[in-house]
Structure formats: structure tokens, C-alpha cells
């Protein structure tokens, strides 16, 4: 029997000093949660195209999906299976990390203060060559745990498959409840036999995991970069993507050295090189795009190539600052991303989008550039669209029920409450997140991950990192 308004008090769970009150009972079965759950007593930052904010609103979730968001509807309340009083929290869509490397999470802090090329060739790739399936799985759990606890509900990732059972790692990711794309990186390294095996592995992985974990997880075709893949490997990547109707995910135009190297090898800059090879015939996510000219931006727009902007990683590796304002002005879809924590060194998307906004203002010497609404959209709705997951990223009817909660009342840096939109960009931090829901299921409660054994993963992380030679 549905509760009346007085009985809503019976639905307040898990009081805590950090996150206030108002949680769904995590002992409730998933089937019960997915019947008709109504969330009330909250401010909803929808991140729809109109950037609507609904104060004291109501959101209905059925079958993993938002079926209604708006003002109170007494009839809907009367028909609810569950009512969750959110205790006045701020609710926003889960954040979307458009480019990451979770398998590398164990490498946090290794190889600081290095440029990209020596960092990859003398630190990252040699250590990754020692990875086992156990290391890759634990590292992925650690990365996803950090992502979810700081508000990320969707990610797009590339991993080095060398020496690991990629399917087993994907199974581990599926158990966390995370949404996203986990992509098998294609390299032209080693012998010709090694390269053929890599391509075969990537194609098989793409077929096996195109729709996985009840549709929450997928994969993309991921040639590493124009400098780490031969033209033949790029063309094979394009074929695999086309035949399996998959997106492409690739590092492009990240450094000045890359531009000069590709021009020397192939007679054209990276974007034109990839266009000639047919890679952009499938929807493509281009990580970085730091070094681009107007002609290249026109090519990206023409082929609907999307860009994953990684401001902190690009700064840390000394690669430069991408001109995101020009990308947006050209009509190119852009999402915010952290890259891997080996070059960031965290997965805090609040910090990432704030840095993105401040860099554009400083680069243009114009405080009107890159307003809060744009930066927040790039980390939610626009980011989701950029990686081909437009079914999430905003709080709208028909979208997946991926959302996060913040309890602002005991946080000095989120006062005064009247300027909440500004605070979400310029003041909020990942550790302000209280609860995280993916597909309508709570995966983080009061800042604790419900789907991953936190203590075990942290202990295993430190044990396993000690087995690696640096």
C-alpha cells in the first residue's frame, strides 16, 4: 500500500552528519526498487538543454528509467511503490568521464614530471607489460570505486590488453554497477604475429561485449593513436568498427611532437592522416585534440568527430591547453575527461570541469568564456552525447536513472545556498557526493561504495603494486 504524506517520515533512512537524511533502504530488493520509486524533497539540477532547476521537486523512476521529473503530483504519490525523502539534497545527473584508463590506476604517482613520449616509453608501457589479470581487475575496481564515490556514473575507457584476460576484467567491471564503454586498445607493437593477435583480440572482444551487463556496458574500437598504430592497423580498426556498428576511441593531436612525427612519417597532420584512412567514417571520440587548426576543426565537424577534453592531464604532461571554445564554436561535441590517474592524478570530475572552465577564461583573457552551464553540461549531458550514450547525462523523462546527491547544509564552501549552480562548478568537490544511483540502483550510500569491498581493494592494491618492477 502506498504511503500518504504523513507516512513519508517512515521512509527516511541512514542519517549521517556528512550526508544528512533520506536514503532508500539498501536491503530492499532490486525488483522492488525498480517498480515505481518516487524521490521527493530535493532540488533537481536537470542539466537538460534549458538547464532547468526544480526546487522541492519530484522524480519518478521505473524500470531503470526516469518516467517523470517536475513538480509534485499527488496522484503519482498515491500510486507509488516506494517514496524516498531526500532531505533537501541537491540532485544532479551522474557525471560522465569521456576518457580514462582504469586498468592503470595502480600506476598513480609513477612517472611524475615527464613529457608524454618518455613517460609512455620508459615508465607506463614497461610496467603495464608486467600486468596480470588480477592486477588489471583490482586496479579497475579501485578506479571505478574512486569514480563512483566522486559522482561519476558513466565512463569511456581504453585498456592495454597485454597479458590479461580482458573478458574477466569486463566481468569484474560489470559487478560494480558502473555504466560505460571499456575498450581493447589496438597497438602496432612487437612482431607481425603479435600485431595480428592484437587485432584479432580486439575484434573478438568488440563482438563479445558490445552489449553487456544488462546493457550498461559496451565497448568501442580503440586504436591507440596514429603514432602507435600503422596505417594498416588504423584501416583494420575502421573495418571492425563499421562491421560491428561500434564507435571509435583514439588519442589524437595530443602534443607538438606527435604532429611533427606524423607529418614526417605520412606527409600530413594526424587528423588528415586518419581521415584519409577512413577512420572517421564511424562516429569517433578523439581524446585530447590539444593541437588543432581551423582546417582540422572543420574536418572534425564534417565527420561528427567528438572530442574528450583532458585539461589536467594535458597540463601535467606539459602537452598544452586545448582550445575548447573554438571546438564548441565549430559545433563539435566535447566532453570532459580525466585521462588515467597516472597522468592526473585523480578521477575527480568536479575538479576537472572547474579546471576546464578556468583555463579557457585565462587563455582568452575573457571571463565570459565558458560559463558554468557549459562546463557542467560537458561533464553530463554533452559528455554523454559525445561518447554515444545520450540515454544518460540529464534528468529527463526517458533517460536512465543515473544521478548523484549532495547534502550542502553542513558544507561551508557550498554556502550561500542561493548560488547553488555556481557552487557546483566553482566550489564543489568529489568528496561532497553522498549517494550515487546507476540504473536506479544505489551503488554509493553516504560516501561508501555498496558494490565493491573498499578495504579489500585498497589492501590488494598495495600488495599487488609491490610485485611490479619499476
Named regions from a protein language model:
Residues 10-12, 20-23, 28-77:
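N-terminal metal-binding scaffold of metallo-dependent hydrolase/deaminase domains
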Residues 400-458:
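C-terminal cap of metal-dependent C-N hydrolases
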Residues 164-290, 295:
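Metal-coordinating catalytic core of metallo-dependent amide/deamination hydrolases
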Residues 108-178, 201-212, 462-470:
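Alpha-helical scaffold segments that flank or form the walls of functional sites
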Residues 42, 59, 64, 88, ...:
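Divalent metal-coordination and catalytic microenvironments
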Residues 276-283, 325-410, 427-428:
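His/Asp/Glu-enriched, well-ordered alpha-helical/loop segment
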Residues 106-138, 176-177, 181-184, 190-191, ...:
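Active-site gating loops and adjacent loop-to-helix segments of metal-dependent hydrolytic enzymes
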Amino acid at each position: 500500500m502506498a504511503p500518504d504524506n504523513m507516512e513519508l517520515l517512515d521512509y527516511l533512512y541512514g542519517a549521517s552528519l556528512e550526508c544528512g537524511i533520506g536514503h532508500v533502504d539498501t536491503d530492499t530488493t532490486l525488483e522492488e526498487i525498480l517498480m515505481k520509486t518516487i524521490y521527493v524533497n530535493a532540488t533537481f539540477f536537470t542539466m537538460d538543454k534549458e538547464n532547468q532547476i526544480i526546487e522541492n521537486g519530484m522524480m519518478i523512476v521505473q524500470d531503470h528509467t526516469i518516467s517523470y521529473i517536475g513538480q509534485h503530483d499527488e496522484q503519482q504519490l498515491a500510486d507509488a511503490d516506494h517514496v524516498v525523502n531526500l532531505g533537501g539534497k541537491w540532485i544532479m545527473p551522474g557525471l560522465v568521464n569521456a576518457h580514462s584508463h582504469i586498468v592503470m590506476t595502480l600506476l598513480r604517482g609513477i612517472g611524475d614530471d615527464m613529457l608524454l613520449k618518455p613517460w609512455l616509453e620508459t615508465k607506463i608501457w614497461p610496467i603495464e607489460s608486467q600486468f596480470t589479470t588480477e592486477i588489471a581487475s583490482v586496479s579497475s575496481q579501485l578506479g571505478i570505486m574512486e569514480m563512483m564515490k566522486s559522482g561519476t556514473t558513466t565512463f569511456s575507457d581504453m585498456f592495454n590488453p597485454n597479458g590479461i584476460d580482458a573478458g574477466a576484467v569486463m566481468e569484474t567491471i560489470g559487478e560494480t554497477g558502473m555504466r560505460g564503454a571499456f575498450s581493447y586498445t589496438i597497438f602496432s607493437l612487437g612482431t607481425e604475429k603479435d600485431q595480428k593477435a592484437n587485432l584479432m583480440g580486439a575484434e573478438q572482444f568488440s563482438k563479445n561485449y558490445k552489449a553487456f551487463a544488462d546493457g550498461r556496458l559496451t565497448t568501442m574500437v580503440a586504436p591507440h593513436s596514429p603514432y602507435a598504430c600503422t596505417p594498416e592497423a588504423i584501416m583494420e580498426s575502421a573495418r571492425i568498427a563499421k562491421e560491428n556498428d561500434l564507435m571509435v576511441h583514439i588519442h589524437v593531436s595530443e602534443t607538438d611532437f606527435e604532429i611533427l612525427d606524423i607529418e614526417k612519417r605520412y606527409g600530413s597532420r594526424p587528423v588528415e592522416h586518419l581521415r584519409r584512412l577512413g577512420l572517421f567514417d564511424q562516429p569517433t571520440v578523439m581524446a585530447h585534440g590539444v593541437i588543432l587548426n581551423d582546417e582540422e576543426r572543420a574536418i572534425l565537424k564534417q565527420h561528427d568527430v567528438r572530442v574528450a577534453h583532458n585539461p589536467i592531464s594535458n597540463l601535467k604532461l606539459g602537452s598544452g591547453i586545448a582550445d575548447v571554445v573554438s571546438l564548441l564554436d565549430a559545433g563539435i561535441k566535447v566532453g570532459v575527461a580525466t585521462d588515467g590517474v597516472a597522468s592526473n592524478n585523480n578521477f575527480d570530475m568536479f575538479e576537472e570541469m572547474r579546471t576546464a572552465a578556468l583555463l579557457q577564461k585565462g587563455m582568452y583573457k575573457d571571463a565570459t568564456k565558458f560559463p558554468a552551464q557549459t562546463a557542467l553540461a560537458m561533464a553530463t549531458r554533452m559528455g554523454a552525447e559525445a561518447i554515444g550514450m545520450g540515454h544518460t547525462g540529464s534528468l529527463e523523462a526517458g533517460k536512465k536513472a543515473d544521478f548523484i546527491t549532495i547534502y550542502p547544509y553542513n558544507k561551508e564552501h557550498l554556502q550561500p545556498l542561493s548560488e547553488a549552480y555556481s557552487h557546483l562548478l566553482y566550489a564543489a568537490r568529489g568528496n561532497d557526493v553522498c549517494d550515487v544511483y546507476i540504473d536506479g540502483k544505489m551503488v554509493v550510500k553516504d560516501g561508501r561504495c555498496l558494490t565493491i569491498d573498499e578495504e579489500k581493494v585498497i589492501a590488494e592494491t598495495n600488495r599487488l603494486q609491490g610485485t611490479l618492477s619499476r
